[in-house]
């Protein structure tokens, strides 16, 4: 549906912000390595034009302008091995009781997609710092989650799985940054508090269309912390695939152009490792998706004191 292949939003060297179609060197697929882009004019969700005007990229920004994002939906427990690694022995008993009706008999695999929301203010760019606000500095349970991100391109209501991909603008990679204590012990059964802080959903580095990603259900996905690989999987291992996810979420609830869907993370999160691995001030977190690229973000603890 889109005439661009790799949509980026960027600050150019002339000081202006543009949408553009990233220009990559031969053999390079990581949009984060783009240094130039052809400027895109018009409506990225409708009539637009990829011009011949080329601009130098100074900084890659969040792929969508704030006014273009309507809702940020997220799936939890959408890879079987991840669901198992965060099963009973790792979780607060109150959370287990709340989730009991949503899980299959083995207590690990959801019957239906597990949906939660993040505020639009949680979105950040592919190189922005991950701000750890004073309220989230209590405890040592700061975690990472690499995820394939779907960007909806046109309104989708009650769509079938067969037609679901027709409503996709493209795909990005994101990090569903999580504070497990606020998510599980303090969240009252709701996950948004522990996952929805400002800047806790960096994504990008651009939006890749189906011109490039022929099969979004077979892409390598990974996380590195300070250069060490801690997650390494493939999107084919999702419990609820991309077609199923879009169709399910559109039943009775219209998905709008600009809606963003984080589709869950594979195994290897800090909470599930032995010993557990929690993010610290100054850590560098890289999440990557095959044929899309990577986001590299530094964890930065705020120096302000919390009022709570």
Kindly give the residue locations of the regions a language model identified:
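Short, conserved beta-strand element in jelly-roll/cupin
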Residues: 116, 144, 149-155, 254
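Short, acidic Gly/Pro/Ser/Thr-rich loop/turn segments
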Residues: 15-17, 80-82, 99-101, 123-124, ...
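N-terminal non-catalytic cap/leader segment that marks the start of a structured domain
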Residues: 1-114, 286, 303-308
């Amino acid at each position: 549906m889109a005439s661009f292949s790799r949509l980026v939003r960027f600050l150019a060297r002339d000081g202006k912000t543009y949408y553009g179609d990233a220009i990559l060197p031969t053999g390079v697929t990581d949009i984060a390595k783009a240094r130039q882009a052809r400027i895109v004019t018009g409506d990225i969700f409708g009539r637009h034009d990829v011009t011949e005007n080329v601009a130098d990229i100074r900084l890659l920004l969040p792929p969508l302008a704030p006014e273009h994002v309507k809702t940020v939906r997220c799936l939890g427990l959408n890879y079987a091995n991840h669901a198992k690694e965060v099963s009973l022995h790792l979780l607060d008993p109150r959370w287990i009781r709340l989730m009991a009706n949503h899980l299959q008999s083995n207590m690990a695999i959801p019957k239906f997609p597990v949906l939660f929301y993040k505020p639009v203010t949680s979105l950040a760019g592919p190189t922005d710092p991950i701000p750890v606000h004073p309220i989230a500095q209590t405890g040592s349970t700061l975690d990472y989650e690499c995820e394939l991100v779907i960007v909806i391109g046109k309104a989708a209501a009650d769509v079938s799985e067969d037609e679901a991909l027709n409503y996709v603008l493209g795909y990005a990679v994101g990090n569903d940054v999580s504070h497990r204590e606020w998510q599980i012990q303090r969240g009252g059964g709701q996950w948004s508090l522990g996952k929805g802080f400002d800047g806790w959903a960096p994504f990008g580095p651009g939006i890749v269309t189906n011109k490039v990603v022929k099969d979004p259900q077979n892409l390598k996905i990974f996380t590195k912390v300070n250069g060490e690989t801690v997650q390494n999987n493939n999107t084919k291992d999702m419990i609820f695939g991309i077609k199923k996810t879009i169709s399910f979420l559109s039943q009775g609830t219209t998905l709008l152009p600009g809606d963003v869907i984080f589709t869950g993370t594979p195994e290897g999160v800090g909470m599930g490792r032995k010993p557990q691995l929690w993010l610290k001030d100054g850590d560098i977190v890289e999440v990557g998706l095959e044929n899309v690229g990577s986001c590299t973000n530094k964890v930065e603890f705020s120096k302000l004191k919390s009022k709570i």
